[in-house]
Amino acid sequence: MRLLERARKEWFMVGIVVAIGAAKLEPSVGVNGGPLKPEITVSYIAVATIFFNSGLSLKTEELTSALVHLRLHLFIQIFTLAFFPAAIWLFLQLLSVTSINEWLLKGLQTVGCMPPPVSSAVILTKAVGGNEAAAIFNSAFGSFLGIVVTPVLLLLFLGSSSSVPFTSIFSQLFMTVVVPLVIGQIVRRYIKDWLERKKPPFGVVSSSVLLMIIYTTFCDTFSNPNIDLDKFSLILILFIIVSVQLSFMLLTFIFSTRNNSGFTPADTVAIIFCSTHKSLTLGIPMLKIVFAGHEHLSLISVPLLIYHPAQILLGSVLVPTIKSWMVSRQKGVKLTRPTV
């Protein structure tokens, strides 16, 4: 009985285990072109649902105030698209003297050059109770920015260049991010009183969508023949990726919690996730365009295929810890405020 109660309370963590297990048993169900059609249901419907859900749940004034938080936007975008790839490049200079496959290392560099994802950072920020409005803006803005910046970074660090279909990617992002968010805000204006009275489970909806994303991502990972590497290389790359993620999460936490940073605990949560997450849905198509016909494309893609599920899993596992820190920090701020 107590076990069932615990499982109900931790339903999301149980859901992650079930999703990964189901993906391992029958990955063909959730791969692109499979029965679930994730190229439509995830890339379009799931992402649109997340941002429509956010549009419904967020107060308009919260979105407006997030737009003018320039310091936060600059921090996230500079960290993601400048510091991250540069730091990875320096790290790879050390790893280049090891026996690790050079194309896997180049794949790690491509991870550093990728834009942030449009969904996972938003969902995790919402799950913690952080600054969701800031996460939405930076995920969307970073994705749009990455369409232009990422090919330039790949050219700079790897010497690879190709024409990217900016128009089609821009239109997909606009239709799945901007339009649902605006529609959600418009609908909210008409049912605001009902929303505040009933308090629908927006967090549960977002978390359920994330479970679907986790499931289809692992279906792709388990069914991908390109990940047929020796176990040592896979374990080593996985260890490096998790170490990089944890190090950068810690780094963003340290920078954003300094006394003179000007960031609230809720801002810090958005910064941690938005600064360290990288997009698979934008990343893989970009790699296929930029490295079209390259004989080592499969190896170059492996680190990103591992990084994406790893960031979702790591973020999901850390949600209770980060939430506990944020709540205690917010209580501390309230207690130290002078009473009038």
Curated annotation (Swiss-Prot):
Family: Belongs to the bile acid:sodium symporter (BASS) (TC 2.A.28) family.
GO cellular component: endoplasmic reticulum; endoplasmic reticulum membrane; Golgi membrane; plasma membrane
Phenotype when the gene is knocked out: Knockout mice present with skeletal dysplasia including growth retardation at birth and at 8 weeks, alteration of long-bone morphology, craniofacial anomalies and advanced tarsal maturation at birth, associated with enamel defects. The proportion of heparan sulfate (HS) in cartilage of knockout mice is significantly reduced compared with wild-type animals. SLC10A7 deficiency has no impact on skeletal muscle heparan sulfate levels.
Pfam annotation, one family: SBF_like
UniProt keyword annotations, A-Z: Cell membrane, Endoplasmic reticulum, Golgi apparatus, Ion transport, Membrane, Sodium, Sodium transport, Symport, Transmembrane, Transmembrane helix, Transport
Protein name (record): Sodium/bile acid cotransporter 7
Major site of localization recorded for this protein: membrane
Subcellular location: Cell membrane; Endoplasmic reticulum membrane; Golgi apparatus membrane
Tissue expr: Expressed in heart, brain, colon, lung, liver, adrenal gland, stomach and ovary. Also expressed weakly in small intestine. Expressed in skeletal tissues.
Source organism of this protein record: Mus musculus (Mouse)
The protein's role, per its UniProt record: Involved in teeth and skeletal development. Has an essential role in the biosynthesis and trafficking of glycosaminoglycans and glycoproteins to produce a proper functioning extracellular matrix. Required for extracellular matrix mineralization. Also involved in the regulation of cellular calcium homeostasis. Does not show transport activity towards bile acids or steroid sulfates (including taurocholate, cholate, chenodeoxycholate, estrone-3-sulfate, dehydroepiandrosterone sulfate (DHEAS) and pregnenolone sulfate).
Gene from which the chain derives: Slc10a7
Cytoplasmic side: 1-10, 59-71, 138, 185-201, 256-270, 320-340
Segments on the Extracellular side according to the record's topology features: 32-37, 93-116, 160-163, 223-234, 292-298
Classification via Gene3D superfamilies: 1.20.1530.20
GO molecular function: bile acid transmembrane transporter activity; symporter activity
